[in-house]
């Protein structure tokens, strides 16, 4: 077994030998060649006013200071309570990788690495950046599927990534035991960097461009002023800031509490081990690539002539620093470590010795056990915080070194230009809310840490901490009948099962046990009538004398007449799609706005911010948790609901997109004639406590019509056939509404100068480079999920955005962005799925006409086109 060395050098972190920089004067990083700056001292200078105050001197905070100052922002101040890198940065293993299983974070990783590659030349500071590449190991067939899945999601990105055979792996990592290795995922350019040196280089660059980095300068108080500025108090004095950015690492919770916020963060212990010199490693002619054994759940890299490896224990064995959760971080904690606990990671040590046998010859010369901070879903929180003006966060970084460079650039661009440079909704701090309790956060953080290296399936569900307090009124009635999905704290039915059907959660890269039940739900909606729980929708009430002016400023569509609803989009100043909502004009000057569950606070923050900036006299209320929503859809929907209300629901009286207040089974509801299925349907908004009674009444009334339930998976198949776009997939901050095919909802000729109007006019005048198209393809047992590569003539030319099996034509269906010249109906392309390219053809959309369109055609004597 691995022999413990003569001593465990706690607190001593062995660094790799730094690479030597080139002599000579570094080029300017300020964008102002030849302009000399006087030397700045972090200890002696002070400012009374600042444009931006960054709280926290770890790698992320210093990166933001660097990027803001480099971009030309004056009066950038960073306040650090002890010294730069104190906290989690100084003891990090320093891994860098282009890989990320998600889509948007690949851009963050890319920007980080590209910055780190040039930072030494720019600043004259050595950063110790090694780029030997990295290999992820597949030792099971399902891992090979996962790698194929990730390959197709990388083809349309700038990142280099290759699926390599065992022979190539052996050549690149000759010390590996190849008995179980089936394949590898190889990223050239991956590696590791010295976190301390990296931070000091960023600090040098920030100072050179005029930023003030002040330490030790602990923030003791934060006070918001009525004009949106902040008073920042420290022992050295106070400072007025136009905005503050919380980048305080594991101190972020304490900073948040100063202004009444409870950030969902949990400090966890993470260990890695450094070995003595290993002769076989020392004899190598080149540095080993970083190794990630996913089944063993550890990373391993070369550290001088030895090895460094760090495991991720299971959620049962991992260690949360509970005392910090309860009592806060000890005031003096900065560059300390925890006691090592090798017993906790022994199974991973054994796995590493089996995979890399030379480890058996080594001594342990160092065990590093330090704190890192986890959010519930392991992703950081980056951006402005809803409900608190000019308060931004960059917190919760479990992988701060690889995120720091890219996040600093991303956040700097957002602060300077008023909108995010690209879509990164998964990092939005407003994805959490009051439902995110400490108990939930700890349960999810444990799960996320323990699941670091599990297989990443599409449609993945994780079950720790569920359900939250946010369950709909129907949860107990439906939970035994369906597979629930988690949406912003809510439980929502994904698919329903019948007696005798497989009810287990069985994730797969191929069609799995929900495929047939979802097909039945699809037919139920298309042929009869079905009910779905839509309670997770975000719901806002807006009223006041300026409500119409505010909404006309926010939305690209016109404001609907009283008693009607429309689909409207909020755009960014550059004309990108920030959000999609339904807007119902309930009474003169009073509106009900509906958005998706995942964008509730994301959208609310934008609306509130614009209302304050413009000085609009409005009242905005978030009523998401007050209202339940039932969707009733299908050709028999009118017949069923008519039994329960005295209101005339006929087509001529209750028109498409009309909204009315009425009673259903004597229960007050706001009924909107709309359905994301594209079929005849209503959304029924009601008091949350009435959900069970309303549901029971509808189900009882629909017995003769064969009423049943349906979930979100069937909804997705239905909306794709109707060519309905989904926010976050077909449209987001990476797309404009013209290329997304949303022209109908954009009124460039309306009098109001809505946000993004002028930019959109310019986009239209210049012409589009790509378009969203709908395509069909015949596959084996796999369907598009979104973000797969589109091929044409041997090259990747675009990407899917979402997909499903079409139960009407029994083929796969997908939306995709392709170049304009390849966007014509009938154009043939290929879609890559699990390592195979399938022929696909662009079709005239929609595949299936919506119920209102079919009605209009029938009235004109046309045919019911499908």
UniProtKB/Swiss-Prot annotation:
Top-level taxon of the source organism: Eukaryota
GO terms for biological process, alphabetical: amino-acid betaine catabolic process; choline catabolic process; choline metabolic process
Keyword Mitochondrion: yes
EC number: 1.5.8.4
Transit peptide among keywords: yes
N6-acetyllysine, modified sites: 114, 148, 168, 223, 335, 360, 434, 523, 655, 764
Enzyme class: oxidoreductase
Pathway assigned to this chain's UniProt record: Amine and polyamine degradation; betaine degradation; sarcosine from betaine: step 2/2
Residues reported to bind FAD: 59-60, 80-81, 87-95, 219, 251, 397-402
The organelle targeting sequence, given as a residue range: 1-50
Modified residues (N6-succinyllysine): 148, 317, 319, 434, 523, 655, 795
Cofactor(s), by name: FAD
Outcome reported for the amino acid change (mutating residue 109 to R): In DMGDHD; shows 10 fold lower catalytic efficiency due to lower cofactor saturation and reduced thermal stability
Region (Disordered): 20-42
Primary localization: mitochondrion
Matches recorded under SUPFAM superfamilies: Aminomethyltransferase beta-barrel domain, FAD-linked reductases, C-terminal domain, FAD/NAD(P)-binding domain, Folate-binding domain
Alphabetically ordered keywords of this record: Acetylation, Disease variant, FAD, Flavoprotein, Mitochondrion, Oxidoreductase, Transit peptide
Associated disorder: DMGDH deficiency: Disorder characterized by fish odor, muscle fatigue with increased serum creatine kinase. Biochemically it is characterized by an increase of N,N-dimethylglycine (DMG) in serum and urine.
Subunit structure: Monomer.
Function, in words: Catalyzes the demethylation of N,N-dimethylglycine to sarcosine. Also has activity with sarcosine in vitro.
Record protein name field: Dimethylglycine dehydrogenase, mitochondrial
Lineage of origin: Eukaryota, Metazoa, Chordata, Craniata, Vertebrata
């Amino acid at each position: 077994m691995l022999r413990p060395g003569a001593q465990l050098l706690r607190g001593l972190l062995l660094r790799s030998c730094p690479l030597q920089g080139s002599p000579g004067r570094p080029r300017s990083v300020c964008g102002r060649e030849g302009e000399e700056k006087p030397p700045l001292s972090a200890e002696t200078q002070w400012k009374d006013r600042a444009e931006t105050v960054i709280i926290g001197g770890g790698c992320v905070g210093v990166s933001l200071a660097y990027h803001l100052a480099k971009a030309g922002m004056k009066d950038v101040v960073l306040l650090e309570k002890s010294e730069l890198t104190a906290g989690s940065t100084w003891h990090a293993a320093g891994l860098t990788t282009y890989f990320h299983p998600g889509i948007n974070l690949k851009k963050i990783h890319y920007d980080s690495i590209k910055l780190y590659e040039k930072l030494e030349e720019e600043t004259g500071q050595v950063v110790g950046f090694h780029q030997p590449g990295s290999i992820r190991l597949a030792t099971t067939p399902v891992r090979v599927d996962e790698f194929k899945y990730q390959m197709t999601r990388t083809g349309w990105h700038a990142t280099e990534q290759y699926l390599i055979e065992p022979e190539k792996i052996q050549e690149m990592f000759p010390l590996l035991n190849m008995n179980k290795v089936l394949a590898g995922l190889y990223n050239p350019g991956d590696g590791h960097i010295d976190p301390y040196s990296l931070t000091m280089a960023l600090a040098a660059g920030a100072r050179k461009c005029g930023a003030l980095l002040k330490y030790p300068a602990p923030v003791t108080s934060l006070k918001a002023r009525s004009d949106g500025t902040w008073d920042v108090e420290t022992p050295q004095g106070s400072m007025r800031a136009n905005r503050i950015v919380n980048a305080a690492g594991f101190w972020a919770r304490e900073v948040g509490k100063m202004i009444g916020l409870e950030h969902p963060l949990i400090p966890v212990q993470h260990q890695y081990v450094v070995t003595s010199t290993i002769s076989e490693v020392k004899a190598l002619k080149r540095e080993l690539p970083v190794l990630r054994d996913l089944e063993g759940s550890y990373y391993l890299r070369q550290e001088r002539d030895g090895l460094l490896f760090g495991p991720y224990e299971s959620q049962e064995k991992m260690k949360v620093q509970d005392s910090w959760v309860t009592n806060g971080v000890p005031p003096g904690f900065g560059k300390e470590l925890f006691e090592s606990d090798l017993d906790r990671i022994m199974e991973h040590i054994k796995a590493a010795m089996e995979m890399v046998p030379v480890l058996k010859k080594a001594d342990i010369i160092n065990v590093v056990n330090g704190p890192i901070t986890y959010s519930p879903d392991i992703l950081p929180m980056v951006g402005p915080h809803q409900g608190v003006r000019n308060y931004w966060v960059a917190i919760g970084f479990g992988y701060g070194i690889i995120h720091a460079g890219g996040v600093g650039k991303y956040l700097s661009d957002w602060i300077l230009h008023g909108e995010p440079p690209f879509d990164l909704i998964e990092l939005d701090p407003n994805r959490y809310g009051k439902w995110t309790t400490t108990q939930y956060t700890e349960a999810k953080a444990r799960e996320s840490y323990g699941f670091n290296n599990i297989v990443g399936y599409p449609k993945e569900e994780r079950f720790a901490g569920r359900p939250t307090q946010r369950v709909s009124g129907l949860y107990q009635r439906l939970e035994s009948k369906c597979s629930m999905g988690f949406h912003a704290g809510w439980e929502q039915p994904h698919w329903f099962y019948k007696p005798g059907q497989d009810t287990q959660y069985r994730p797969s890269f191929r069609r799995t046990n929900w495929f047939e039940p979802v097909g039945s739900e699809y037919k139920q909606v298309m042929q009869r009538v079905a009910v779905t729980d839509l309670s997770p929708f975000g719901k806002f009430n807006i009223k006041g004398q300026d409500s119409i002016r505010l909404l006309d400023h926010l939305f690209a569509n016109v404001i609907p007449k009283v008693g009607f609803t429309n689909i409207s989009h909020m755009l960014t100043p550059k004309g990108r799609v920030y959000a999609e909502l339904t807007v119902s004009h309930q009474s003169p000057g009073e509106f009900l706005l509906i958005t998706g569950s995942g964008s509730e606070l994301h959208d609310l923050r934008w609306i509130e911010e614009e209302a304050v900036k413009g000085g609009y006299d409005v009242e905005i209320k978030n009523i998401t948790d007050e209202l339940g929503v039932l969707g009733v859809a299908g050709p028999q929907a009118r017949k069923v609901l008519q039994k329960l209300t005295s209101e005339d629901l006929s087509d001529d009286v209750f028109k498409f997109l009309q909204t009315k207040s009425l009673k259903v089974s004597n229960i007050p509801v706001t009924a909107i004639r709309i359905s994301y299925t594209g079929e005849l349907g209503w959304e029924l908004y009601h008091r949350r406590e009435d959900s069970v009674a309303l549901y029971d009444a509808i189900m009882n009334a629909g017995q003769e019509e064969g009423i049943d339930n349906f979930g979100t998976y069937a909804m997705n198949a239905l909306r794709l056939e109707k060519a309905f776009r989904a926010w976050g997939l077909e449209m987001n901050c990476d797309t404009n509404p013209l290329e997304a095919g949303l022209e109908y909802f954009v009124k460039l000729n309306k009098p109001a100068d809505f946000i993004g109007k002028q930019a959109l006019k310019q986009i239209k005048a210049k012409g589009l480079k790509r378009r969203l198209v709908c395509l069909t393809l015949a596959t084996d047992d796999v369907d598009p999920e979104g973000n797969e590569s589109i091929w044409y003539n041997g090259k990747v030319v675009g990407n899917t955005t979402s997909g499903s099996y079409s139960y009407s034509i029994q083929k796969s269906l997908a939306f995709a962005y392709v170049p304009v010249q390849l966007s014509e109906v009938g154009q043939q392309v290929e879609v890559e799925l699990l390592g195979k390219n399938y022929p696909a053809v662009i079709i005239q959309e929609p595949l299936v006409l919506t119920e209102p369109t079919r009605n209009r055609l029938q009235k004109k004597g046309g045919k019911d086109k499908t």
